[in-house]
Structure formats: structure tokens, C-alpha cells
């Protein structure tokens, strides 16, 4: 199954499975209609009638929605009736053209025995009214999720962009300089490429304690990087601080890195605790996964995040107490160290040997007393 590179449980964006299934359904229906042996005119007439009823049903549903939206025309649509109509009916010209075209074909085809068009129109209006009053026209949860993802309407989308714009975009460009300054004063404690990055923890259950040592005693606070300050949103000399942690293994230091949680996950957890937010545990898990995927996509295209930031997404097993956050972080650090060594060896092997290229050119002189002419075919 397709999933994000961060974690197997993080889904990839939806593809075109629904469209492919619709093509299969279309083929099956065409074969069924062909096998029934009905006259083509008869089949076409009922098909056009059905399409016309669908368009008319959508139109009637939009008219009912328009009655409510007109009450908010100034607050939601800046007093524009055209915007209000488009919000409820889509493009009125397109929908009206489809409706008129369907009605034209309905009356132009040979008539068959059936209920009058006026009776069918009244029945269609009745069914749409019942759908609205009884709440039968709601979308399925999967459809709502697909619409929100496609339109970037999710809570996770806004949180991920807020986290990047309001925090990561500001601190990542200066991170390497702050680490170099720290190393100058503390004997290169953060040496190596993997130690000179910001590692962001992404627990999918949104469990974000304020103290990392509470999550794992083998993660121990060591020091802080030099603070970064700046004026933002009217706040003078706003301070940005990052913490350095040492990772213990068998009681010994096994790694050192700049480590922290993604604070928006704490917001998601808090939202699920407030009934006013209408945010269930399942919603929290879905939004946490979408937050991780969106943040990964943002950082993949952000030049300031190149080699400056790494995401560590994980999910603690509910029935397994052997999970160790420090070991999870160490696993990522060691994996990156291996990748750094592999990339370095490939670059070294790609450079041609300089043992012969760097030598001084030598002038080779023949031992003959007289130089030979340019032509050697003389007799």
C-alpha cells in the first residue's frame, strides 16, 4: 500500500482509484444494456432523462442553499449576489446549459409510455426536499476527507504551514552558524554532519511532554544553543532557543543532537480534550498523519531546510512497553551516518586519480643529433 517515507501508517495523497472504478462500472453497464437487447433510442431516452433529473436535483438543492446564503451576503460574500449564486450553484451558465440540453434531447427523442414530465418534476422536488429535511444528502466520511485534502481545508494543513512560516523558516537559515558558535566554545561537542541538524520528533499519538526525559530517561538535557533573536509581529527581540540532548545507551553517551517536539502536535492533543473543538481521537490521529505529510512536503521544497532539519515520525505500540524513544532517535542518527559515509565514498570514487594528472609535463628529447623532417616518406 502507498505510504509516506516518514512512517508506514502515514498515507500518501489519494490517487485516481475512484475514476478507475467508474470506468469499470461504465463498461459493465454498457455490456449489460447491450445484452438486454433494448432499442438504442429507448435506452438513450432514459439515460438523458436520468441525467436531466440529476442536474435538476442539483439545481433545486442549490436554490435551497441560496435561501440561507442570501442572509450572509454581506459578511461572507462582500455584498456580491454573483458570488453568492456561484457559491451555491457553481457556474449557473454551465449548469443551465446542461439542463436545457438534457430537456431538449428528452423531448426530441421518440416518446415512450411513462409518467408525465410535470409529475416527474414534482416528484424530484419532493425527493430533494426530503433529503434536506431528513439529512440524507450528506457525504460519506471518505468523500469529506478527500474534499478537504484536495482543497487544503484540513486543520493539519494550516498547522503545518504555520509551524514552517512562523518558526522553521526563521531559525533554520541561522542554525548552522549557531552550532558553529557553540562548537567554538565547547570543544566541538556537536561534531559530524548528523549532529549539526535539528531533529523534530513527530509522535503520531500527539503525546508531547514538556520534558523529554519524561518520555525516555535515556534522553538527557545537555545544554542550549546560542539564542536567536528577531523582531516579529510587533514583538521586539523575540527569542528563539533550541536544546541539545545527549542520548544514552547502556549508561554511556551514544549520541548528541539538537532535538525537540513539533509543538503543533501538542495543539492537536489539546483540541481533542475540549468538547467545544468537536475533535475526536480518530480526528486527531488523522490530522497528525496529515500534519507530518504536509510538513514533509513543505520542507522538501524549502531551500533553508536542506541538510538542516530531519523529521522523526513514530508511533508507540499500545501493547508493547519495550519501545524506546532514545533508540528510535539513535537508529535515525546511525542510519544517516551510514548514508553520509556511502555518499562520501561515492563522491571519492567518482573523482579521477590525480597521481598522473598532477605530475609536471616532461619534455622527451630524442638522442639523434639532427632532427627528422616532418615527412618520413623520403627516400
Curated annotation (Swiss-Prot):
Effect of residue 263 to A: Strong decrease in c-di-GMP-binding
Gene3D superfamilies: 1.20.5.5200, Stimulator of interferon genes protein
Region (Cyclic dinucleotide-binding domain (CBD)): 153-340
Locus of motif pLxIS motif: 363-366
Segments on the Lumenal side according to the record's topology features: 35-44, 107-116
GO molecular function, one term: signaling adaptor activity
Region (Mediates interaction with ZDHHC1 and ZDHHC11): 1-190
Annotated region (Disordered), positions in chain: 341-370
Known outcome of mutating residue 364 to A: Slightly affects ability to induce the production of type I interferon
GO biological process, one term: cellular response to interferon-beta
Main localization category: endoplasmic reticulum
Side Cytoplasmic, residues: 1-17, 70-91, 135-379
Keyword Chloroplast: no
Membrane-spanning ranges: 18-34, 45-69, 92-106, 117-134
Membrane topology: Multi-pass membrane protein
Modifications made to the protein after synthesis: Phosphorylation by TBK1 leads to activation and production of IFN-beta. Following cyclic nucleotide (c-di-GMP or cGAMP)-binding, activation and translocation from the endoplasmic reticulum, STING1 is phosphorylated by TBK1 at Ser-366 in the pLxIS motif. The phosphorylated pLxIS motif constitutes an IRF3-binding motif, leading to recruitment of the transcription factor IRF3 to induce type-I interferons and other cytokines. The phosphorylated pLxIS motif facilitates SENP2 recruitment during late phase of viral infection. Phosphorylated on tyrosine residues upon MHC-II aggregation. Ubiquitinated. Ubiquitinated via 'Lys-63'-linked ubiquitin chains in response to double-stranded DNA treatment, leading to relocalization to autophagosomes and subsequent degradation; this process is dependent on SQSTM1. 'Lys-63'-linked ubiquitination mediated by TRIM56 at Lys-150 promotes homodimerization and recruitment of the antiviral kinase TBK1 and subsequent production of IFN-beta. 'Lys-48'-linked polyubiquitination at Lys-150 occurring after viral infection is mediated by RNF5 and leads to proteasomal degradation.
Phosphothreonine carried by residues: 229, 354, 356
Family of this protein: Belongs to the STING family.
The protein's assembly and partners: Homodimer; forms a homodimer in absence of cyclic nucleotide (c-di-GMP or cGAMP); 'Lys-63'-linked ubiquitination at Lys-150 is required for homodimerization. Homotetramer; in presence of cyclic nucleotide (c-di-GMP or cGAMP), forms tetramers and higher-order oligomers through side-by-side packing. Interacts (when phosphorylated) with IRF3; following activation and phosphorylation on the pLxIS motif by TBK1, recruits IRF3. Interacts with RIGI, MAVS and SSR2. Interacts with RNF5 and TRIM56. Interacts with TBK1; when homodimer, leading to subsequent production of IFN-beta.
Entry protein name: Stimulator of interferon genes protein
Gene: STING1
